[in-house]
Protein backbone atom coordinates (compact mmCIF):
# COMPACT_ATOMS: atom_id res chain seq x y z
CA UNK A 1 0.00 0.00 0.00
CA UNK A 2 2.91 2.36 0.76
CA UNK A 3 4.22 1.91 -2.79
CA UNK A 4 0.88 2.51 -4.48
CA UNK A 5 0.52 6.17 -3.46
CA UNK A 6 3.90 7.30 -4.86
CA UNK A 7 3.31 5.26 -8.03
CA UNK A 8 -0.14 6.81 -8.52
CA UNK A 9 1.33 10.30 -8.02
CA UNK A 10 4.10 9.59 -10.54
CA UNK A 11 1.58 8.29 -13.09
CA UNK A 12 -0.62 11.38 -12.62
CA UNK A 13 2.37 13.68 -13.14
CA UNK A 14 3.37 11.83 -16.30
CA UNK A 15 -0.13 12.07 -17.74
CA UNK A 16 -0.33 15.81 -17.03
CA UNK A 17 2.06 16.45 -19.92
CA UNK A 18 0.10 14.27 -22.35
CA UNK A 19 -2.66 16.71 -23.36
CA UNK A 20 -3.85 16.59 -26.94
CA UNK A 21 -3.79 20.35 -27.45
CA UNK A 22 -6.26 21.79 -29.92
CA UNK A 23 -3.92 24.55 -31.15
CA UNK A 24 -2.30 23.35 -34.41
CA UNK A 25 0.64 25.71 -33.83
CA UNK A 26 1.54 24.14 -30.50
CA UNK A 27 2.28 20.59 -31.56
CA UNK A 28 4.74 18.50 -33.39
CA UNK A 29 4.94 18.03 -37.12
CA UNK A 30 1.86 16.40 -38.68
CA UNK A 31 3.13 14.68 -41.81
CA UNK A 32 1.40 13.08 -44.79
CA UNK A 33 2.40 12.18 -48.34
CA UNK A 34 0.67 12.96 -51.63
CA UNK A 35 1.37 12.83 -55.37
CA UNK A 36 3.90 9.99 -55.08
CA UNK A 37 5.13 8.21 -58.20
CA UNK A 38 8.12 6.49 -59.76
CA UNK A 39 8.51 6.76 -63.54
CA UNK A 40 9.20 3.29 -64.96
CA UNK A 41 12.99 3.32 -65.12
CA UNK A 42 14.99 2.80 -68.28
CA UNK A 43 17.93 1.50 -66.25
CA UNK A 44 17.95 -1.93 -64.60
CA UNK A 45 19.91 -0.57 -61.63
CA UNK A 46 18.50 2.92 -60.84
CA UNK A 47 15.17 4.72 -60.59
CA UNK A 48 13.97 8.13 -59.44
CA UNK A 49 11.06 8.78 -57.10
CA UNK A 50 8.89 11.84 -56.62
CA UNK A 51 6.38 12.83 -53.94
CA UNK A 52 5.28 15.68 -51.72
CA UNK A 53 5.56 15.53 -47.94
CA UNK A 54 2.97 17.85 -46.37
CA UNK A 55 3.39 19.14 -42.81
CA UNK A 56 0.17 20.50 -41.30
CA UNK A 57 1.75 20.78 -37.85
CA UNK A 58 3.28 23.69 -36.02
CA UNK A 59 6.82 22.29 -35.87
CA UNK A 60 9.28 21.65 -38.67
CA UNK A 61 10.80 18.21 -39.17
CA UNK A 62 13.60 16.80 -41.24
CA UNK A 63 13.59 13.86 -43.66
CA UNK A 64 16.75 11.98 -42.71
CA UNK A 65 16.56 8.78 -44.76
CA UNK A 66 14.42 6.54 -46.94
CA UNK A 67 14.49 2.75 -47.00
CA UNK A 68 12.93 0.23 -49.38
CA UNK A 69 13.28 -3.49 -49.97
CA UNK A 70 13.14 -2.69 -53.71
CA UNK A 71 16.65 -1.21 -53.72
CA UNK A 72 20.01 -1.65 -52.04
CA UNK A 73 19.86 2.03 -51.08
CA UNK A 74 17.60 5.03 -51.48
CA UNK A 75 19.32 8.40 -51.33
CA UNK A 76 18.08 11.98 -51.16
CA UNK A 77 19.16 14.29 -53.98
CA UNK A 78 18.64 17.94 -54.76
CA UNK A 79 19.30 19.77 -57.98
CA UNK A 80 21.20 23.04 -57.72
CA UNK A 81 21.56 24.85 -61.02
CA UNK A 82 22.32 22.13 -63.53
CA UNK A 83 23.96 19.68 -61.13
CA UNK A 84 22.51 17.02 -58.88
CA UNK A 85 23.99 16.29 -55.45
CA UNK A 86 23.27 13.83 -52.68
CA UNK A 87 22.24 15.34 -49.33
CA UNK A 88 21.99 13.83 -45.85
CA UNK A 89 18.61 15.36 -45.02
CA UNK A 90 15.95 17.80 -46.21
CA UNK A 91 13.74 20.11 -44.14
CA UNK A 92 9.96 19.77 -44.01
CA UNK A 93 8.79 23.22 -42.84
CA UNK A 94 5.96 23.75 -40.34
CA UNK A 95 2.69 24.44 -42.19
CA UNK A 96 4.53 23.74 -45.45
CA UNK A 97 5.73 20.97 -47.71
CA UNK A 98 8.80 19.33 -49.17
CA UNK A 99 8.33 18.62 -52.86
CA UNK A 100 10.29 15.99 -54.77
CA UNK A 101 9.79 16.70 -58.48
CA UNK A 102 11.49 16.21 -61.81
CA UNK A 103 14.29 18.76 -62.11
CA UNK A 104 14.38 19.34 -58.35
CA UNK A 105 14.76 17.30 -55.18
CA UNK A 106 14.14 13.58 -55.74
CA UNK A 107 14.67 10.12 -54.34
CA UNK A 108 17.28 7.98 -56.07
CA UNK A 109 16.73 4.21 -55.87
CA UNK A 110 20.11 2.55 -56.41
CA UNK A 111 21.03 -1.12 -56.78
CA UNK A 112 17.49 -2.11 -57.75
CA UNK A 113 16.72 -5.69 -56.77
CA UNK A 114 14.57 -5.86 -59.92
CA UNK A 115 13.32 -3.25 -62.35
CA UNK A 116 9.87 -1.95 -61.33
CA UNK A 117 7.28 -1.80 -64.12
CA UNK A 118 4.26 0.38 -64.74
CA UNK A 119 1.26 -0.70 -62.66
CA UNK A 120 3.30 -2.01 -59.73
CA UNK A 121 3.92 -0.25 -56.44
CA UNK A 122 7.17 0.21 -54.55
CA UNK A 123 6.96 0.44 -50.77
CA UNK A 124 9.24 2.90 -49.02
CA UNK A 125 9.64 4.01 -45.44
CA UNK A 126 10.40 7.67 -44.82
CA UNK A 127 12.44 8.39 -41.67
CA UNK A 128 12.37 11.74 -39.89
CA UNK A 129 14.40 13.46 -37.17
CA UNK A 130 11.39 13.97 -34.87
CA UNK A 131 8.36 12.11 -36.24
CA UNK A 132 7.89 8.39 -36.53
CA UNK A 133 8.48 6.67 -39.88
CA UNK A 134 5.89 6.89 -42.66
CA UNK A 135 5.29 3.88 -44.92
CA UNK A 136 4.25 4.82 -48.46
CA UNK A 137 3.26 2.64 -51.42
CA UNK A 138 4.48 4.51 -54.49
CA UNK A 139 2.86 3.62 -57.83
CA UNK A 140 5.09 3.02 -60.83
CA UNK A 141 3.89 5.13 -63.77
CA UNK A 142 4.92 5.19 -67.43
CA UNK A 143 8.38 6.56 -68.19
CA UNK A 144 6.79 9.68 -69.73
CA UNK A 145 4.20 10.26 -66.97
CA UNK A 146 3.56 13.91 -66.12
CA UNK A 147 1.67 14.56 -62.87
CA UNK A 148 -1.34 16.86 -62.91
CA UNK A 149 -0.47 20.22 -61.38
CA UNK A 150 -3.99 21.46 -60.72
CA UNK A 151 -3.68 24.39 -63.13
Label for each model-derived stretch:
Residues 20:
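Short, conserved catalytic or interaction motifs in soluble domains
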Residues 14-17:
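C-terminal motif of bacterial Sec signal peptides marking the signal peptidase cleavage site
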Amino acid sequence: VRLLAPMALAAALLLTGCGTGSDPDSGAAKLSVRSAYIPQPVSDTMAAGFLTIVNEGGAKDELTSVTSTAAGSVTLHETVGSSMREVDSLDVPAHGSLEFRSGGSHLMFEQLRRKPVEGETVTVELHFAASGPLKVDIPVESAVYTPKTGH
